[in-house]
């Protein structure tokens, strides 16, 4: 545990002191937001002290450091998490109580940081927690997005995107390091020539300089003084305001250069369906990579006087393809700024970079137009050309005279730069994020690369920060668990397995059911307050919360809900286990089908809630602005976890793990980490349906799948789609959605992700869910078995595997 012991009295004094010094007010006059900031400052002081200790230890021991680059870190609120990890949560709660404040109210003052979007960013945040707790010398790097992804509002059933001004409460957790500001060069012209000694000289001029200003967020570990650091880069213009233009009234022109530079850190994932959006995204990626590498290299050189030992002291881990430019940028720094030969620079680079792939979707394996890369980073493009040239020569040794194969595997081809291919060529390790996903990478996505570089490929199944998602989010369940097995699982999550011994303990199972009901009530209260919908507490809380994408098949869930509505309308007195279907997701602003799907969910919700014949048995709720703090309410309350992507498309998933750890039962395909959840709990404790990966892939490849035949022969599906065409009583036409399922669109096949094909199997699995739910003893037993076997999905385990098998660094974690 932390060396420092925090007492109620000391914390009261510290908070009162912060209120006086920062707000010039006494406790009795302070507002909740002032008290929140005072608490945050007190906690941050402790974090800063530990961060300095950690940095001093890193300097002294000289061990290999991990640098984790990701475009997003969905960290969630910091106050409670840090107070919990530091061991001060109880004392802080008591201190605030004495001062007339409820801790829960103070927590609510903190906005969720807008630094991430979905699973990729949440995984990165969980891994920072794991690194800090496991004692891995790790630093995360990303961009300090001023407005984050976006704040979602639902207006007349439709998603509206608003700026997410999270910094008003999030800035307190960030420590600026102005003295470590770096300059990133965008655009310009490169002249190269060989001097009299045969050395390549690079002259880079007429570029646009952008300052990268670092802000550090300390990330606490549990029960340790070790701190991981998340360094966020803010873009600023170094060019002074043109006062002459400003004074003459040309205000916009005077500010133009400032604005162009600062847009880089304005918004996460700007739309890229136009050239300007593509340009901004690529600038963001290069800005992150260049600032980060300059930072690491400058500090390394200051300590060792050379970069020749760089690979022995650093691992650059790129989380998905977005930071892949780290490979040519490191080459640039080593050659152009440190006079290394190509061979020496490549040897260092290819021993320093590790790559995690997170997708098998072709459209997500990033490709950039050569012309755009050339325009924004001309020297980097030269280096990419050279990497490609040498790589293709290497490929020729494996596939002599097979020009088609080499073109297929090349880094640069068809006027595009293939980032995944660049990542594979320049990394010493390539890992998938579930056992199934890693096999798909080897057997289908990167088959030929695997034949050449089989030793590079490995698997590390994703994991979640179990202390946040169980210990903090579900305190009643934690109290029950710890009454039986103690607290060891907090740092050794595999100890949750001991709960298997209580699978037939009727008293414990009943208590588990009571706790679930309490958590359901909390979510029901939230739904009533935010959606105005009364939900049946005796209904099954069936939840699908995740990024909205066609492959995740929210549509399959919707089709089933409409079919249940029809059943109840036909037979209002049927024996029916009530259901509350809960959705939460954001659609990318330019993803029309996803946005229309959100509107469809809300149309169905309104129709059902206005129908007295069914509304006590069936409910549909869409929770707007899904984020970490909302997930912390949803996960403990969920009873059914919808993990229904078409098999072979979901790399892993982590929501499935959070639900499992909180006692929800999974209904899902054999996809991603669902496969490993099924192995962990046994097929009798999960509801599996649908095609498996080989069948789904074979059907797609054959071209023989005909959704129209299913529509014509299945009266249930026909009725569902016909209603979609005719509408749900609110005047909105969903013919376009039905046509996508039956006829295809946008160049894609009909029902691309085969929702109609898996519908019957899914509906049958949902019938099994209802039948088991009637027997609460059996249901609670299955829930306990899921909780007991969830420890293998802790981020601590994932980080330890990365440390041992990929990064080759020390860890405190014991398997």
Set out the residue ranges of the language-model regions.
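A conserved ligand/cofactor-binding region detector
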Residues: 1-815
């Amino acid at each position: 545990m932390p060396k420092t012991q925090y007492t109620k009295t000391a914390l009261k004094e510290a908070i009162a002191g912060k209120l006086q010094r920062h707000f010039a007010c006494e406790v009795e006059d302070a507002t909740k937001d002032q008290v929140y900031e005072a608490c945050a400052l007190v906690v941050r002081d402790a974090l800063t002290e530990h961060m300095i200790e950690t940095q001093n230890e890193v300097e002294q021991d000289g061990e290999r450091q991990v640098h984790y680059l990701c475009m997003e870190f969905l960290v969630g609120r910091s106050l409670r998490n840090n107070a919990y990890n530091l061991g001060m949560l109880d004392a802080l709660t008591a201190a605030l109580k004495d001062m007339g404040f409820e801790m829960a109210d103070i927590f609510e003052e903190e906005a969720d940081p807008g630094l991430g979007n979905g699973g990729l960013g949440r995984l990165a945040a969980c891994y920072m927690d794991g690194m800090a707790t496991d004692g891995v010398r790790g630093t995360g790097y990303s961009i300090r997005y001023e407005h984050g992804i976006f704040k979602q509002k639902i207006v007349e059933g439709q998603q509206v995107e608003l700026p997410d001004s999270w910094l008003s409460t999030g800035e307190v957790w960030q420590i600026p390091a102005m003295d470590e500001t770096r300059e990133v060069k965008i655009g310009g012209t490169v002249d190269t020539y060989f001097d009299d000694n045969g050395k390549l000289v690079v002259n880079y001029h007429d570029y646009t300089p952008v300052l990268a200003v670092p802000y550090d967020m300390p990330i606490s570990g549990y029960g340790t003084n070790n701190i991981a650091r998340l360094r966020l880069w803010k873009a600023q213009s170094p060019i002074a305001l043109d006062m002459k233009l400003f004074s003459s009234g040309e205000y916009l022109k005077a500010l133009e250069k400032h604005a162009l530079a600062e847009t880089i850190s304005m918004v996460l994932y700007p739309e890229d369906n136009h050239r300007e959006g593509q340009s901004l995204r690529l600038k963001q990626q290069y800005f992150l990579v260049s600032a980060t590498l300059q930072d690491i290299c400058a500090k390394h050189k200051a300590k060792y006087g050379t970069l020749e030992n760089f690979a022995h002291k650093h691992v650059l881990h790129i989380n998905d393809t977005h930071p892949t430019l780290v490979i040519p940028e490191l080459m640039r720094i080593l050659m152009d700024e440190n006079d290394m030969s190509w061979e020496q620079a490549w040897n260092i680079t290819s021993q320093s970079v590790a790559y995690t792939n997170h997708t098998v979707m072709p459209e997500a394996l990033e490709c950039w137009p050569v012309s755009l890369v050339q325009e924004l980073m001309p020297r980097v493009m030269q280096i990419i050309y050279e990497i490609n040239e040498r790589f293709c020569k290497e490929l020729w040794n494996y596939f002599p005279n097979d020009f088609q194969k080499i073109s297929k595997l090349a880094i640069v081809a068809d006027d595009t730069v293939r980032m995944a291919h660049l990542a594979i060529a320049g990394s010493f390790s390539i890992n998938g994020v579930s056992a199934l996903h890693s096999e798909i990478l080897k057997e289908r996505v990167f088959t030929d690369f695997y034949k050449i570089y089989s030793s590079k490929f490995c698997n590390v199944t994703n994991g979640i920060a179990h202390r946040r998602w169980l210990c903090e989010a579900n305190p009643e369940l934690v109290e029950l668990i710890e009454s039986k097995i103690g607290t060891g699982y907090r740092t050794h999550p595999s100890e949750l397995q001991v709960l298997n011994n209580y699978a037939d303990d009727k008293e414990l199972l009943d208590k588990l059911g009571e706790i679930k009901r309490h958590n359901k009530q909390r979510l029901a209260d939230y739904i009533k307050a935010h959606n105005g919908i009364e939900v049946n507490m005796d209904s099954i809380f069936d939840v699908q919360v995740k990024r909205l994408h066609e492959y995740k098949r929210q549509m399959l869930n919707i089709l089933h809900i409409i079919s249940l509505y029809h059943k109840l309308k036909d037979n209002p007195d049927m024996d029916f286990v009530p259901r509350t279907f809960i959705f939460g997701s954001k659609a990318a602003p330019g993803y029309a089908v996803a946005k229309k799907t959100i509107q469809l969910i809300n149309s169905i919700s309104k129709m059902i809630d206005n129908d007295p014949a069914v509304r006590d048995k069936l409910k549909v709720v869409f929770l707007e602005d899904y984020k970490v703090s909302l997930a912390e309410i949803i996960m403990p309350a969920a009873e059914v976890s919808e993990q229904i992507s078409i098999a072979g498309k979901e790399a892993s998933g982590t929501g499935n793990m959070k639900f499992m750890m909180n006692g929800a039962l999974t209904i899902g395909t054999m996809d991603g980490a669902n496969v490993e959840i099924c192995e962990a709990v046994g097929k009798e404790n999960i509801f599996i349906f649908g095609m498996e990966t080989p069948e789904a892939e074979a059907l797609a490849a054959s071209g023989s799948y005909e959704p129209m035949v299913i529509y014509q022969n299945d009266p249930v599906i026909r009725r569902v789609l016909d209603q979609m065409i005719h509408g749900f009583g609110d005047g909105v036409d969903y013919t376009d959605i039905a046509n996508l399922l039956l006829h295809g669109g946008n160049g894609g096949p009909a029902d691309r992700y085969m929702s109609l094909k898996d519908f019957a199997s899914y509906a049958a699995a949902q019938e099994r869910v209802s039948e088991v739910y009637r027997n609460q003893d059996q249901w609670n037993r299955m829930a306990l078995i899921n909780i007991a076997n969830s420890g293998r999905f802790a981020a601590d385990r994932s980080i330890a595997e990365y440390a041992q098998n990929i990064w080759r660094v020390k860890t405190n974690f014991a398997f």
